[in-house]
């Protein structure tokens, strides 16, 4: 039986002063505000406001216009690896861009702690810069020296959305050596990630038709675990086999800590909040996360896994949203079939 993971209140985490922090801001340079999506200069200004003594590193692409950007200590540009094309949904998958720009920025970080941030976000406080220094680190699956703090956005609760190995990669705060460990990984092979023939999934509230084996968060997490000799082969994005689920719970509760996104001190723009269900209901909350960490007995684990299985195979059929998505899936499938003829 796994040992309980005691997760204290976020208010009991240790705040880290900005003079001990490097901030890696990664992504494209945004010169114009679109709706409530800030410019890169606004991002930099917010970081300087709330983390005044931090080492600020901007990691972007070769050829980007970085003139007149104020508040940068170090700038690094990289060749743009480009997106991986989803030929069914006709949109880009930017996992390789995220890996490269984050990894290159982290290579310049010299402080003990690091905040991984994006060029289209702003800070509203320094609350994200907190660490659970009381965490027990000798247990199996404790891969970081200290847990990495993230916001709750996109840390999927499998009892609602049956997805595992899905931590948040938008904002992360932890020891620099731990973030380097997480992001020090190769570029994803498009021929592996994109199937020659798409798969049709009719189970789960997130039913769909896609050629992608897994989503970016899962790719990055699985590659990180493989470097630690923890090998998990998900059949698809919504694979929730009991064995994989059990491993994920241990990895999640022993290596990550959550701040509820609305109280994290990070301003998420509407583009990241455009689907209210996926930001308000589909993710762990601080309270649910801490409770699950404490309840590590086998019966509790079975109950949580059973809820995830019910969500995938039964409960989805009782939501109108599921049928709307199923209709969109059918239209995607029909369009793909016509294209192949």
Language model feature labels by segment:
Residues 19-21, 48-58, 73:
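Short loop->beta transition adjacent to catalytic acidic/histidine clusters or analogous donor-positioning motifs
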Residues 21-34:
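A conserved hydrophobic helix/loop-capping motif in glycosyltransferases and polysaccharide synthases
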Residues 59-108:
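Active-site-proximal specificity loops/subdomain of glycosyltransferases
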């Amino acid at each position: 039986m796994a040992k309980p993971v005691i997760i204290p209140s976020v208010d009991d985490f240790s705040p880290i002063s900005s003079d001990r922090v490097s901030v890696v801001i990664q992504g494209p340079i945004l010169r114009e505000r679109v709706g409530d999506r800030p410019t890169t200069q606004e991002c930099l200004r917010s970081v300087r406001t709330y983390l005044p003594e931090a080492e600020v590193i901007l990691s972007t692409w070769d050829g980007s216009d970085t003139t007149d950007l104020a508040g940068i200590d170090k700038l690094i540009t990289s060749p743009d690896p480009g997106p991986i094309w989803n030929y069914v949904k006709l949109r880009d998958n930017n996992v390789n861009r995220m890996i490269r720009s984050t990894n290159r920025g982290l290579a310049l970080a010299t402080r003990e702690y690091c905040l991984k941030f994006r060029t289209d976000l702003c800070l509203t406080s320094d609350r994200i810069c907190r660490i659970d220094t009381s965490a027990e680190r000798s247990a199996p699956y404790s891969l970081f020296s200290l847990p990495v703090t993230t916001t709750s956005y996109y840390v999927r609760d499998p009892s609602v959305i049956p997805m595992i190995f899905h931590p948040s990669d938008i904002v992360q705060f932890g020891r620099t050596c731990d973030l380097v460990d997480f992001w020090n990984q190769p570029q994803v092979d498009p021929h592996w990630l994109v199937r020659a023939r798409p798969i049709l999934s009719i189970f789960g509230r997130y039913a769909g038709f896609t050629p992608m084996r897994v989503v970016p968060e899962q790719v990055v997490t699985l590659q990180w675990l493989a470097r630690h000799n923890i090998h998990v082969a998900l059949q698809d994005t919504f694979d929730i086999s009991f064995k994989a689920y059990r491993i994920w719970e241990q990895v999640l509760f022993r290596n990550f800590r959550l701040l509820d996104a609305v109280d994290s001190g990070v301003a998420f723009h509407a583009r990241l909040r455009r689907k209210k269900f996926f930001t308000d209901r589909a993710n762990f909350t601080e309270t649910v996360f801490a409770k699950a960490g404490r309840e590590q007995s086998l019966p509790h684990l079975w109950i949580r896994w059973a809820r995830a299985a019910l969500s995938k195979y039964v409960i989805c059929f009782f939501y109108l949203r599921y049928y709307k998505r199923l209709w969109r899936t059918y239209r995607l499938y029909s369009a793909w079939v016509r294209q192949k003829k």
